[in-house]
């Protein structure tokens, strides 16, 4: 399946002086598949090392991370010739081998001509865990501390990319709707409404996407079988895998807290005020108790954090309130499965009167913006005005209102525009494209068109 990140991988390959690349992303977003395809299509050959499955490689790296000796060992083990620039070396699940992470540093410093890509689903979690344990254990000897430092992140020695679930445009490509995707982009530029029949077709596909989501295996099953039930089965398997990771990559006491926060997300999003409240994870819960658990979920890539900003001035980062935030799932399809949303309700999300469907639309927009590299922030003032998202685009701050259907209101948006003199405002809803009174109407299915400088 065609993925947008391929263009970024090709750009990395062609950039002079590129460093070893770390590709991060939640489990099951397609990292291994896309890297193998990249190796097949853009190199003479490639070698993929699954560090979670090949103990021989891990044992070798414990004793030796000299780049040339690592190359010789991999050539012997996989019976393949590794040539600078012509061979892609893929180190998969690098979070399971801290010495492989350290090796990237030496490749960059001593033999940068070798093209290496490391993929890690829980790398941020693993590195954070190693650093935290090192800080807590004051009795650790100097020799042991030096060994533990092997799991430090090679800052400045690697390039980085993140792969997210497939967005709606990639879903359109996978379902042979490339022409529709192009038409949506064209009308986003012109602000002219699509023909009503095309608009309805696009909304229908959007509603299907709410069920299928963007996890590649779910999309693949849908393309092959058109069975939403099969998609739900795949999603449940992925959710079960996430639960297992919580036990594997965290201490037992922390695991309990992680799962409490994770399981509270549907209830958090069901509230009119979607601010994350620790008390919904456990009665009497506080940031001190659950802060580490939330951080684990964010680092794992399974959730997205949307921070409050109390002002609409540039730079928005200066006005973030890190204690006030919303939490979304990284994939809207997984949200539907986790919340046990009836499939028929999602397939008619635009017309169905249901409060949680508003949260589903909001989650969909959040993951779409994040996949486009946009930081997630929302705004509210001291009164009752609140906007689902605010986006910094160059020298402008753009307010974004999200509605699941055609019933829209502009009270909060007008308040923001008047106070901060925004040149344009975005309203994302089931309405067709349009532009009037400084408000750009963006259909839900066109959220993938929103990009920033």
Question: What role is predicted for each listed range?
Answer:
Residues 53-84:
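Short glycine-rich substrate-engagement loop in P-loop NTPases that contacts/grips substrate
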Residues 219-387, 391:
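Accessory nucleic acid-recognition modules appended to NTPase machines
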Residues 127-270:
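Interdomain motor-coupling "hinge/lid" segment immediately C-terminal to the ATP-binding subdomain
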Residues 31:
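Conserved lysine of the Walker
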Residues 2-16:
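Pre-Walker A adenine-sensing motif
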Residues 365, 369, 387-406, 425:
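Conserved catalytic cores of phosphodiester-cleaving nucleases, focusing on short active-site segments
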Residues 34, 38:
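Hydrophobic positions on the alpha1 helix immediately C-terminal to the Walker A/P-loop
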Residues 90, 115-121, 162, 171:
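Structural recognition of the conserved hydrophobic beta-strand(s) that form the central parallel beta-sheet
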């Amino acid at each position: 399946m065609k993925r947008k990140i391929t263009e970024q991988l090709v750009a990395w390959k062609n950039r002079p002086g590129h460093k070893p690349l770390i590709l991060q992303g939640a489990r099951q977003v397609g990292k291994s598949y896309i890297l193998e395809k990249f190796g097949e299509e853009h190199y003479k050959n490639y070698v993929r090392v699954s560090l979670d499955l090949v103990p021989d490689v891990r044992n070798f790296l414990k004793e030796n991370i000299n780049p040339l000796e690592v190359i010789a060992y991999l050539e012997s083990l996989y019976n393949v010739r590794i040539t600078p620039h012509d061979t892609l070396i893929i180190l998969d699940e690098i979070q399971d081998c801290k010495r492989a992470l350290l090796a990237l540093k030496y490749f960059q410093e001593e033999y940068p001509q070798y093209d290496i890509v490391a993929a890690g689903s829980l790398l941020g979690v693993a590195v954070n865990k190693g650093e935290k344990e090192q800080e807590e254990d004051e009795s650790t000897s100097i020799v042991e501390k030096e060994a533990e430092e092997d799991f430090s992140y090679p800052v400045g020695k690697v390039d980085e990319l993140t792969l997210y679930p497939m967005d709606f445009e990639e879903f359109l490509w996978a379902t042979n709707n490339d022409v529709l995707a192009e038409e949506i982009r064209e009308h986003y530029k012109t602000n002219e409404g699509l023909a009503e029949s095309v608009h309805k077709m696009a909304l229908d596909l959007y509603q299907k996407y709410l069920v299928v989501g963007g996890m590649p295996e779910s999309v693949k099953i849908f393309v092959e079988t058109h069975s939403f039930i099969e998609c739900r089965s795949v999603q449940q398997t992925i959710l079960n895998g996430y639960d297992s990771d919580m036990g594997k990559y965290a201490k037992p006491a922390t695991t309990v807290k992680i799962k409490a926060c994770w399981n509270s997300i549907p209830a958090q999003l069901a509230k009119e005020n979607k601010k994350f409240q620790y008390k919904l994870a456990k009665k009497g819960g506080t940031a001190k108790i659950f802060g580490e658990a939330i951080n684990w979920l964010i680092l794992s890539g399974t959730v997205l954090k949307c921070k409050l900003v109390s002002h609409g001035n540039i730079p928005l980062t200066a006005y973030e309130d890190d204690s006030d935030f919303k939490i979304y799932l990284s994939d809207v399809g997984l949200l539907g499965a986790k919340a046990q949303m009836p499939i028929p309700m999602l397939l008619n999300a635009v017309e169905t009167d249901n409060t949680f469907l508003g949260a589903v639309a909001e989650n969909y927009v959040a993951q779409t913006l994040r996949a486009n590299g946009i930081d997630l922030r929302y705004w509210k003032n001291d009164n009752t005005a609140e906007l689902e998202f605010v986006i910094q685009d160059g020298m402008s701050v753009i307010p974004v209102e999200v509605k699941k259907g055609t019933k829209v209101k502009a009270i909060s948006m007008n308040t923001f525009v008047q106070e901060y003199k925004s040149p344009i405002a975005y309203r994302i809803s089931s309405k067709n494209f349009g532009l009037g009174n400084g408000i750009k109407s963006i259909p839900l299915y066109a959220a993938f068109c929103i990009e920033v400088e």
